Amino acid sequence: MSYPRTLEVLARLHVDPHFREAWRRDAPGALTPLGLTPPEAEALQRVAPDVVERAGRMMDFHRTERVREQLAWVDEAKRPELVPLRARFLQDVPPEVLNREEAIAYCRFLEAGEHAPHAKLLQRLPAYVPQLARCERLRLQLAWGLAPMPASGPRVESFDYPVLTLLAALDAPGWPPVAPKPTCVEYLKVPNLPAVMTRELPSP
């Protein structure tokens, strides 16, 4: 038996909800396209379903906590409308290696437009949520050097809503009602630290 190949399939059962569900419904059918040897396939078919399910739940919990660590406002106790979006994110988006990368991926998921597969779920949220997600994604990317800063001075981005004011208001439960208001946000990199300072500027 090829340990690397078997471990690869076990890892996929751990992290891939689509594959895990296919294996749960029909293990031989899910394994057939993978080109496993008969002993490998037979061994993987004998894995206890409850073990696979438990490992999947642990992975989903771990990914969820990684996002929450970076994005405090992604709090389903305060905003239960995010629950189905989290489930869809875990199902559709492969896991990332680092916490910040997981949070950036979640921001991109929330930024997706009307043609995204999960667009109907996004439509249940306030219109400003994609703007919040973009603001937070840029904060993380700029802090960790994953997006370019100007050669000197801050980076300034335009938004359709007062996103920093909104983020502060999200300490309270629910979604605050906020009208569109063109706003600029200044991102200033903190030297030698994975951080940026942000402030809202009057729109020109």
Q: Model-found features: residue ranges?
A:
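Terminal, compositionally biased segments used for targeting/anchoring and flexible tails
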Residues: 1-75, 80, 111
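Surface-exposed acidic/polar loop and edge beta-strand patches at domain peripheries
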Residues: 76-78, 82, 96-99
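Hydrophobic packing positions characteristic
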Residues: 86-203
